[in-house]
A protein has these predicted regions:
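N-terminal, positively charged nucleic-acid-binding surface of large information/translation enzymes
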Residues: 3-202, 206
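Structured secondary-structure scaffolds
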Residues: 3-30, 98, 145, 154, ...
Length: 320
């Protein structure tokens, strides 16, 4: 537990303390990523609800971080609320869900989401029951580099993304001997391809700052050409799709699209909970998210390599 947490969280906490030592205003945000199929699988194995699983691990992780000496218990900076603070939140937070749904509807209204039929793997049991398999529960051979442990829609080895039918020799990770097949299912896709030019310019402006592996993965993705990415999935455990139509009743907002917004939602939730004495009150989060005259604003992210695409391509891309 401690080694796993240390690699991700200690560098961020060190940076937070360094920025404070320099006299700067700083807000540190993170939290527990609590949606997706791995949670439901654990719940089924333990015979408990998904909410019980995430409640247990959020408590364990939050305590472990504080025990490591991280500053998550210091919600308000000791210099005053105007200097910031920290919040370790969670994606099952009701406000996180509400803000994510607000953003989802804004993108829909701006015509940045499109309905599209996609092919998705599903597992068929002996009685003919169908269970759709999330991408990370399908493994096979990458059609680009030949990696034999590629996931259903992405290869972590070369960074390639592809459609379900393009993966070679697919099998269910949880049940390798099960019969699997591809079936059509309708989902909403984020028009990421419309931001190709903007993201290429953004990438060029960051070349002297990003690490070599980030630059390489970015170049690879952009050279392949960005494609629309699904923002909904056939999952029960997740944030409901906020569309009043029975077509979307059994679908949830895709976790990669939802969780990456946690940095933004966490800042807003921090302001709503702790910034009552700040001059801007619940809008205090804007000081860390909106560039203003005579203000130098900077974001620093600490993450695993598998999160690079989400942070690079989905975080900077919305118009508003």
């Amino acid at each position: 537990m401690y080694k796993r947490q240390a690699g991700n969280s200690l560098p961020a906490d060190i940076q937070y303390k360094y920025e404070r030592a320099r006299g700067r205003k700083v807000l540190m945000c993170s939290g527990s990523d609590e949606h997706g199929t791995p949670i439901t699988v654990t719940a089924e194995e333990k015979g408990i609800t998904p909410q019980s699983v995430v409640d247990e691990f959020h408590t364990i992780n939050a305590k472990a971080l504080v025990d490591l000496g991280c500053s998550w218990s210091q919600n308000i900076d000791t210099r005053g609320i105007e200097y910031g603070g920290s919040l370790y939140n969670r994606t099952t937070d009701i406000r996180h869900k509400e803000i994510v749904q607000e953003i989802f509807m804004q993108l829909l209204e701006q015509d940045l989401l499109q309905k599209q039929t996609m092919q998705q793997y599903c597992e068929i049991d002996t009685e003919g029951n169908v269970k759709f398999l999330p991408d990370r529960y399908v493994v096979g051979i990458c059609p680009v580099c030949g990696n034999e442990e590629a996931r259903g829609d992405q290869c972590d080895s070369c960074g390639s993304t592809y459609e379900a039918h393009e993966l070679n020799s697919p099998k269910s990770k949880s049940n390798p001997n099960a019969k699997i097949e591809i079936r059509d299912t309708d989902h909403l896709f984020y028009k990421l391809n419309e931001f190709q030019d903007d993201l290429e310019k953004h990438s060029q402006s960051r070349q002297k700052i990003w690490k070599p592996n980030v630059r390489a993965m970015t170049k690879n993705w952009l050279n392949m050409g960005l494609r629309p990415r699904a923002v909904t999935r056939d999952l029960e455990w997740g944030i409901d799709v906020p569309i009043d139509d029975t077509e979307w009743t059994n679908k949830s907002i895709y976790v990669w699209f939802e969780a990456v917004q946690g940095y933004y939602t966490c800042a807003r939730i921090w302001a709503e909970k702790f910034a009552s004495e700040h001059p801007d009150k619940e809008n205090a989060w804007e000081n860390w998210w909106i560039n203003k005259p005579n203000q130098s604003l900077r974001h620093i992210y600490f993450m695993g390599k598998d999160n690079i695409p989400c942070l690079l391509y989905t975080s900077p891309s919305p118009r508003d």
